[in-house]
């Protein structure tokens, strides 16, 4: 359905509930969700959302993901205090990836770094590009 927007003019749109019903969640009921800082365009992290996480995020304005490792909803910042507030939701041209433009409070990464993308390929080495902003033990406790 989202493909209908490929030839649409700016300002044209589709009904959200109809689009939501046609999103191509994978066999586990998930879509990839990229979090990006809304005012700097910094890419913060990649996580997954099921329909319930997506609906909760839109309802509350606080980003909620689905944790594949725990098999449950994961409300970003619930234990660390490093919450993400949704500024804008975008869908890619196929509707199979979400872009969450957020206001990130503190580090986004569980390592205490601002972004999960701190490993940079330089030649034949993967180099750490930034130090943690916060000690992970401070974020999550012992």
UniProtKB/Swiss-Prot annotation:
Keyword flag Cytoplasm: yes
Obligatory cofactor(s): Mg(2+); Zn(2+)
Signal peptide boundaries: none
GO cellular component: cytoplasm
EC main group: hydrolase
The enzyme's E.C. designation: 3.5.4.19
Binding locations of Zn(2+): 93, 109, 116
Localisation: Cytoplasm
Database matches in Pfam families: PRA-CH
Binding site for Mg(2+): 92, 94, 96
InterPro entries to which the protein is assigned, alphabetical: PRA-CH, PRib_AMP_CycHydrolase_dom, PRib_AMP_CycHydrolase_sf
Cofactor note: Binds 1 Mg(2+) ion per subunit. Binds 1 zinc ion per subunit.
KW Zinc (keyword) present: yes
Biological or metabolic pathway of the protein: Amino-acid biosynthesis; L-histidine biosynthesis; L-histidine from 5-phospho-alpha-D-ribose 1-diphosphate: step 3/9
Function: Catalyzes the hydrolysis of the adenine ring of phosphoribosyl-AMP.
Subunit structure: Homodimer.
Annotated protein name in UniProt: Phosphoribosyl-AMP cyclohydrolase
């Amino acid at each position: 359905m989202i493909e209908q927007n490929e030839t649409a003019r700016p300002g044209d749109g589709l009904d959200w509930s109809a689009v939501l019903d046609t999103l191509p969640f994978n066999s586990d009921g998930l879509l990839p969700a990229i979090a990006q800082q809304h005012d700097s365009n910094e890419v913060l992290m990649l996580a997954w959302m099921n329909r319930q996480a997506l609906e909760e995020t839109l309802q509350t304005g606080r980003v909620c993901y689905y944790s594949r490792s725990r098999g449950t909803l994961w409300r970003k910042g619930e234990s660390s205090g490093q919450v993400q507030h949704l500024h804008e939701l975008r869908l890619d041209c196929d509707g199979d990836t979400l872009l969450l433009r957020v206001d990130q409070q503190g580090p986004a990464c569980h390592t205490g770094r601002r972004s999960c993308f701190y490993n940079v390929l330089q030649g034949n080495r993967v180099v750490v590009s930034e130090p943690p902003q916060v000690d992970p033990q401070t974020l999550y406790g012992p």
